[in-house]
Amino acid sequence: MKKVHLLTLIALIMLGLSGCEKAKVTNEASADVFVKSIKNAQGVTVYTAIHSVFSYNPMKSVSVTSPGGAPLQLTNFENGGNSFFNEPAVTDYSTTAPASGAYTYLVKFNDGEEITYTNSLATAALLPANITSLAKTASGDSVYIKWDAIPSSHAYQLKVMKGTKQAYYQPAFADGSVPLKPNLRLGFRLNQLTGEGSGTYTFELTGLLFESTTYDYLQAISTSTQNIEL
């Protein structure tokens, strides 16, 4: 998901000197395309393109055209049209990475203005993390997830789900070790996770690769999941 909340400029143009005129807000949005990789049911790494467009001004619709000219309407939106994105189905993933190059976004704002944006996708992708362990401690009051570090990943984030409900979310974090550790882990008190009661919990670990060290636009993400009974 990436929903890129890039802080774009919002200009307030004051008309007249009396202060009685109405202010106009300049329409501006940020658009991002990035590669998402997962392992399918057969254990094969597959890829798709994720599109995310954000604006402080409500948008009516967003469409994107790939470097090869294929159009796609972004039908998922949140916050009254401040964010548009695509939710890929299993059939949208392929063993071949998405086409690199410039993706063109046509953004239609609620006031009728239409603006075109572009974002370029490189060829880099991330492998899904190899989760080596997900288990409760001997005392039974904590749970640890362990995984092999993903080559080239800038950071990670973790989401814990119980069915369709989010039980816990760990925002992006990075390994600050020098040198970087080959294996990583996160631990949680059980009472941090089990607000939805006992049952099957899904840990969703995502690796993040940004376009640059300004850490705003994404180039690629990868997601691995594993279940545990809590």
Task: Name the predicted role of every residue range.
Residues V4-H5, L12-Q42:
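Bacterial Sec-dependent N-terminal signal peptides
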Residues K39-Q73:
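Post-signal-peptide N-terminal segment of Sec-exported extracytoplasmic proteins
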Residues H51-V53, D141-S153:
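Conserved aromatic anchor
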Residues E78-Y93, V178-G187:
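Aromatic sugar-binding surface patches on proteins
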Residues D92-S100, R189-T200:
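Surface-exposed, short loops/turns at beta-strand junctions within beta-sandwich domains
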Residues E113-A122, T213-Q226:
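Edge beta-strands of extracellular beta-sandwich domains
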Residues A125-A135:
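Proline-enriched interdomain boundary motifs that mark the N-terminal boundary
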Residues N191-I221:
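Beta-strand-rich modules
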